[in-house]
From Swiss-Prot:
Keywords: Amino-acid biosynthesis, Aromatic amino acid biosynthesis, NADP, Oxidoreductase. The gene is aroE. GO terms for cellular component: cytosol. GO terms for molecular function: NADP binding; shikimate 3-dehydrogenase (NADP+) activity. It catalyses: shikimate + NADP(+) = 3-dehydroshikimate + NADPH + H(+). This is Shikimate dehydrogenase (NADP(+)).
């Protein structure tokens, strides 16, 4: 039976095995999907071991997406755009790297939340692997403007310099330079939720009818509490993004596109 896994640190909380099992059952695919916690200095060794054991592919989560990018012997255009990889496929000794985070996020916002991004003012918090993975697909959705904010502004500026913004106004700044700014969509791509940490964000970020979106899932994060206190019209966690990016990875591996709605509903009800 074909075997897959998710690799991260930490990874105990991951719902990816449940999601892929549901997709497999729904589509009649025979596969096994597990989770592997890699030591912080042991990602490459773990991937090599799984590849040698005959695994067909792995998903990659925090904090290994940049290492996965470097490890891949072949990269898709969207992986190159992201500079980070969350889906590896093992084929005839080669390691194919792709990134499904961005398409997962955009599909969740546009389809599941029925919230348009075109013409909107978007704030992306963070400049790590999660933010890298979603920047280009967000720009492809044609927002009016997109601001990347990060504690260290040079990381945000470097990230902005690596993409083609098209018609979107793109800028980068530190968290301390967000005062007096207003946005229609604020996306938290930092790992602050993992550490129960509140970001140093000013009051007044949310425009009327604004969406606050945290890529973390499983519980209310400090960012989501902040958004509620600040009066954000809609607040969403990253469960929909998780399911949508998993569906794209499943399609890459199996060439069958699963229906995400029943899987999301089951996870919400659990």
């Amino acid at each position: 039976m074909d075997r897959y896994a998710v690799i991260g640190h930490p990874v105990e909380h991951s719902k990816s095995p449940l999601i892929h099992a549901a997709f497999a059952q729904q589509t009649g695919q025979q596969l096994e999907y597990g989770k592997v916690q890699a030591p912080l200095d042991g990602f490459v060794a773990i991937v090599t071991d799984l590849q040698e054991k005959g695994y067909r592919g792995v998903n990659v989560t925090v904090p290994f997406k940049f290492e996965a990018y470097s490890l891949a012997t072949e990269l898709t255009p969207r992986a190159r755009d992201a500079g980070a990889v969350n889906t590896l496929t093992f084929t005839d000794g080669a390691i194919h790297g792709d990134n499904t985070d961005g398409v997962g996020l955009v599909r969740d916002i546009l389809q599941n939340l029925a919230f348009t991004l075109a013409g909107k003012r978007v704030l992306l918090l963070g400049a790590g692997g999660a933010a890298e993975g979603v920047l280009a697909p967000l720009l492809e959705a044609s927002p009016l403007s997109l601001c990347i904010a990060n504690r260290t502004v040079d990381k945000a500026e470097a990230m902005a310099a690596r993409v083609r913004p098209g018609q979107t106004s793109l800028d980068a700044r530190g968290f301390d330079a967000l005062a007096d700014q207003e946005f229609d969509v604020v996306i938290n791509a930092t790992s602050s939720g993992l550490h129960n940490e509140r970001l140093p964000l000013p009051s007044g970020l949310f425009a009327a009818d604004a969406l606050a979106y945290d890529m973390m899932y499983g519980r209310e994060t400090p960012f989501m509490r902040y958004a509620r206190e600040e009066g954000a019209s809609r607040i969403a966690d990253g469960l929909g993004m998780l399911v949508e990016q998993a569906a794209e990875a499943f399609y890459i591996w199996r060439r069958v596109r699963p229906d995400t709605a029943p899987v999301m509903a089951a996870l919400r009800a659990a």
